[in-house]
A protein has these predicted regions:
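Divalent metal-coordination and catalytic microenvironments
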Residues: 56, 77, 97, 108, ...
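Sec/Tat-exported extracytoplasmic proteins
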Residues: 42-49, 53, 57-60, 64, ...
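Bacterial N-terminal signal peptides
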Residues: 11-23
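Acidic-glycine-rich active-site phosphate/pyrophosphate-binding loop
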Residues: 113-127, 214-224, 416-424
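Acidic/His- and Gly-rich active-site-bordering loop/insert found
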Residues: 29-137, 142, 146-167
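Histidine/acidic-residue-rich, glycine-tolerant segments that coordinate divalent metal ions
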Residues: 128-136, 142-143, 159-281, 291, ...
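Metal-dependent amide/peptide-bond hydrolase catalytic core
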Residues: 29, 247-531
Length: 531
């Protein structure tokens, strides 16, 4: 046994610690360097980001009809070295774009569809449709995939330069406003080899979240009643009115609504009420969204809806069939991924808003009688189960289907104005302005930096998968209400776009002639008075 010499043990421990810590310190420095490269590569795409955001805004295509949008975005990815597969999961406007080899497979996605009836001239603070009755980006989905594409290109460049193994899969959220694609993506196996997924959604803040997120799950169902025609005045007793059945179902549902959980949300539109009043309608349809907080609660509402439809059919001497048009699982964010992403969000920070940006935001709020709140200069806090207000139900997002398949988070990025109304023209007013462009730039930086964390830190993905299996899957299990015979409702909105597209094409953005879409439309920024 060697003799103990005072000071020698201390020196030995210090030397061992220095040796042990050296790789970690080097890795941290390398990671910081990689992230700086990615941020710079995103910044270098600022002009292309503006063009993409404006271009998709001008296409203004609703769910399943995102033909120009899908082709435009997938072409950009293809030109940047990604392998594109179009028409995945039986959806013509869906695609995957893949790149890389070895290492983990990280999926990145955002939605691309817009909303019916919310056409809006961007960059003005008052309601004024570009085309009366046309669809428009009243949810800001024109900004999400440009963000994802910019982040993916930046990550690809960094990985190539630094010889980092790993793979990317880029995908668009088709028909999110119909909640009608992502469950089919999962069923088709698009995510079976994916290690983790980052999704993005437009907001007026900059943050992410984990745990049960408070979104309702949802099933979208159309009920079609079948009756018998007759002369409505001459021989009404010979008829069996399918429209009567629809009205009885709606009335019965509205009486039942009071006795359902307070977290439920349900709404409907009559999609077919017959032809003309003097013919007893032999066919009529009503389309329902049934929403609630859990898989079981959504199924319970679906079962009640089916029972009421059968009762309405019996009451009217008709028959009924129903078809599932879409599904969305409740949302659940992954804690390790959210914490990693939030560190990057804080590192990136909010955009540097100009006086013009603040003036336009205030003008939108004032002219539409909304609460006055400036564009924020601070990132929001990380949303956790402990600091989130208790949810009593609300909207849905079919990213939930992917969240229950692989570890997933949603990053909210600041491309819109506080206080605007969702699914409304006020939410479209800023979406082709510098406010939207700047929010996409910072969002793309945070996404790119988080992807690099996943590619270079195996423990992050291990922890994410452990949380997914040991925490998330202990709370519930994925149980979509899709039958094997259910197919994506790709016919939806086709008739609307066939009628409107010729007029809309005249307003598509031409970046070869105009620096911005606002310039093409003759809008001076900021316009703060009604036009």
């Amino acid at each position: 046994m060697s003799k103990f010499v005072p000071g020698r043990r201390t020196a030995l421990i210090a030397a061992l610690l220095a040796t042990a810590l050296q790789p970690a310190v080097a890795q941290a420095a390398a990671s910081k360097s990689l992230k700086a490269q990615a941020a710079a590569d995103v910044e270098a795409q600022t002009k292309q980001i503006q063009v993409m955001v404006d271009q998709v805004f001008s296409y203004a295509e609703p769910g399943f009809q995102e033909v120009r949008t899908s082709a435009y975005l997938s072409d950009i990815l293809e030109k940047n070295g990604f392998t594109v597969t179009r028409g995945v999961a039986g959806i013509p406007t869906a695609f995957t774009a893949t790149w890389g080899s070895g290492g983990p497979l990280i999926a990145l996605g955002s939605d691309i569809d817009d909303l019916l009836g919310v056409s809006q001239i961007p960059g003005i603070p008052n309601v004024k449709p570009l085309i009366e009755g046309a669809p428009g980006h009243g949810e800001g989905h024109n900004s999400g995939m440009p963000l994802i594409i910019a982040a993916a290109i930046a990550v690809k460049q960094v990985m190539e330069k630094n010889h980092i193994p790993g793979r990317l899969m880029i995908w668009p959220g088709v028909a999110e406003e119909l909640l009608a694609s992502k469950a089919y993506y999962v069923r088709a196996g698009l995510f079976k080899d994916v290690d983790a997924c980052i999704f993005t959604h437009v907001s007026n803040d900059f943050s992410t979240a984990y745990g049960e997120l408070g979104n309702n799950g949802m099933v979208s169902v159309e009920y079609t009643f079948h009756g018998k025609t007759a002369h409505a005045a001459g021989m009404p007793w010979e008829g069996r009115s399918a429209l009567d059945a629809v009205e009885i179902m709606d009335t019965a549902w509205n009486f039942r609504r009071e006795h359902l959980p307070v977290t439920q949300r349900s709404h409907y539109v009559i999609t077919n009420g017959g032809g003309q009043p003097n013919v007893v309608p032999d066919r009529a349809s009503v389309w329902y969204y049934f929403r609630d907080r859990t898989f079981a609660a959504v199924k319970s509402m679906y079962d009640v809806g089916n029972e009421i439809s059968e009762a309405a059919a019996k009451a009217t001497g008709t028959t009924v069939t129903h078809q599932v048009l879409g599904y969305a699982a409740p949302n659940f964010g992954n804690k390790p991924l959210a914490e990693a992403a939030y560190a990057n969000i804080k590192a990136v920070g909010m955009p540097k808003w100009s006086a013009d940006d603040q003036a336009f935001a205030k003008a939108v709020q004032e002219n539409n009688k909304r609460k006055i709140a400036p564009l924020s200069d601070k990132v929001a806090e990380l949303s956790t189960p402990e600091n989130r207000p208790q949810s009593i139900g609300g909207g849905s997002d079919d990213i939930g289907d992917i969240m229950w398949t692989v570890p997933t988070i949603t990053i909210r990025y600041p491309s819109n104005i506080p206080s605007v109304i969702g699914h409304n023209v006020t939410a479209a007013m800023a979406m082709a302005t510098p406010i939207a462009h700047k929010g996409v730039v910072v969002g793309a930086k945070a996404v790119a930096m988080t992807v690099l964390d996943m590619m270079t830190t195996p423990k992050l993905l291990t922890d994410a998968k452990t949380y997914f299996t040991d925490v998330q899957l202990k709370t519930d299990h994925y149980a979509p209400l899709l039958a094997d015979t259910d197919k994506p409702a790709i016919w939806l909105n086709a008739k609307t776009m066939a009628e409107l597209r010729p007029a809309m094409e005249k307003f598509y953005y031409d970046p070869t002639k105009y620096d911005s879409y606002l310039q093409q439309l003759g809008i001076k920024y900021p316009t703060v008075t009604p036009q």
